[in-house]
Amino acid sequence: DRPRPARLSHARFSKNHSGRTHSMKDKAGRKHRPLDVFDFPDHSQLSSFSRLGENEKDEESYETFDPPLHSTAIYADEEEFSKQCGSHLPSTPQEKEAKRSSDTSEIEASENESVKISAKKPRRKLKPISDESESPEESDVRRKVKPTENISTQHEAVSATALPGLSEKPAEAVTPQKTGPQSAESSAEKATLATEHQLETQKNKMLPGKRKKPRSYTTDTSDCAPVWCLKEKKASEIMELDVFLSAFENILLEYEQKIDSRVCKAAINKFHSNLKEELIKMVQEIQMLKTLKRKNAKIISNIEKKRQRLIEVQDELLQVEPELKQLQIKYEELQERKASLRKAAYFLSNLKQLHQDYSDVQEEEPSVKETYDSSSLPALLFKARPLLGAEHHLQNINYQLENLLDQK
């Protein structure tokens, strides 16, 4: 197995991190990169230059990615870190002269090394050379690069004092930030928080008639986000999420006051706002669910009352049904009697009228004999009825007399 260079993978992504235009030193470094004199691995020899062509295929995929844009970028050596720090800090005339001398020394060293290395891709880092195989040319390069090392150490000290919130080892993990507008940004954040709080308080004052205020806030003395308040709520309306949200905000405010990093505060505020929105949404949904359950319980109780009343009415109807049938029968009988009485009254009125007419005729013409025809047959039968009764009575007497004679 061929030994690979002992170098961190993050070093490949640290190039062009600041996004600024490079000087002549960077352009020359892309074609002929100087030797890394600050890194001395155990297994590195001069013969490693011959194996660059073979290792380029294996490591070519790592060079196509963009550098990471976060604070965990690790610089491979102090020279790259000095480039990043130097782009953010104002340089003095002495530092400018030192940079120019270092640029010329690196260009000369790269020209000497280009004779030895014929096939080399742009933006390719060479493997460092150990102390055992150190040539006189390399020692000259090492002596010439010392001014750049001093400059990089000065920039490291300045960056360490300007960013106390970061780690004390800038070569391992350093975030290149601008220290100048930090106070202006913090003041702008304070102003935006104050305006947001004023708008929220104005909204709460404009709606005084509401009994329930799901978003009632109280301001803290420090410049922080509003705090969830439980004093304006009733004891029956307070839920576990309200208590959790109030305690969470108090703890978060105390923790935020202890932190000095602006990035951490921004992340904490973002996390706080997202979590608070979710919790407030959950509280509102739970409150709506409670009101719906209460309304549902009322509707169910009303339905039960109406159902009970319906059962009672059905029982009463079953009890009244026999009486209803009897009343219906009586009603039918009365209707029949009424109809028969109406018919009898009509017949009697007609008969009375007939008798009146007959008496009137007899008074007017008493000598005229009565004549009967088929139309007067009912009147003749009615008049002969007592005669027929007398005949039948006589027949009965005759029959009884015959029986007595036979017995003698």
From Swiss-Prot:
The keyword Thylakoid does not apply. It comes from Bos taurus (Bovine). A motif (Nuclear localization signal) lies at residues 293-310. The modification Phosphoserine is found at S102, S105, S110, S114, S130, S133, S135, S183, S187, S222. This is Centromere protein U. Residues 94-103 have a biased composition (Basic and acidic residues). Residues 1-218 are annotated as: Disordered. Component of the CENPA-NAC (nucleosome-associated) complex, a complex that plays a central role in assembly of kinetochore proteins, mitotic progression and chromosome segregation. The CENPA-NAC complex recruits the CENPA-CAD (nucleosome distal) complex and may be involved in incorporation of newly synthesized CENPA into centromeres. Plays an important role in the correct PLK1 localization to the mitotic kinetochores. A scaffold protein responsible for the initial recruitment and maintenance of the kinetochore PLK1 population until its degradation. Involved in transcriptional repression. Keywords: Centromere, Chromosome, Coiled coil, Cytoplasm, Isopeptide bond, Kinetochore, Nucleus, Phosphoprotein, Repressor, Transcription, Transcription regulation, Ubl conjugation. Component of the CENPA-NAC complex, at least composed of CENPA, CENPC, CENPH, CENPM, CENPN, CENPT and CENPU. The CENPA-NAC complex interacts with the CENPA-CAD complex, composed of CENPI, CENPK, CENPL, CENPO, CENPP, CENPQ, CENPR and CENPS. Interacts with MLF1. There is a cross-link at K178 (Glycyl lysine isopeptide (Lys-Gly) (interchain with G-Cter in SUMO2)). The keyword Hydrolase does not apply. GO terms for cellular component: cytoplasm; kinetochore; nucleus. It comes from the Eukaryota. Belongs to the CENP-U/AME1 family. Residues 1-33, 118-127 have a biased composition (Basic residues). It is found in: Cytoplasm; Nucleus; Chromosome, Centromere, Kinetochore. Residues 273-350 form a coiled coil. The lineage of its organism: Eukaryota, Metazoa, Chordata, Craniata, Vertebrata. Phosphorylated by PLK1 at Thr-72, creating a self-tethering site that specifically interacts with the polo-box domain of PLK1. The modification Phosphothreonine is found at T72, T92, T104, T192. Residues 176-186 have a biased composition (Polar residues).
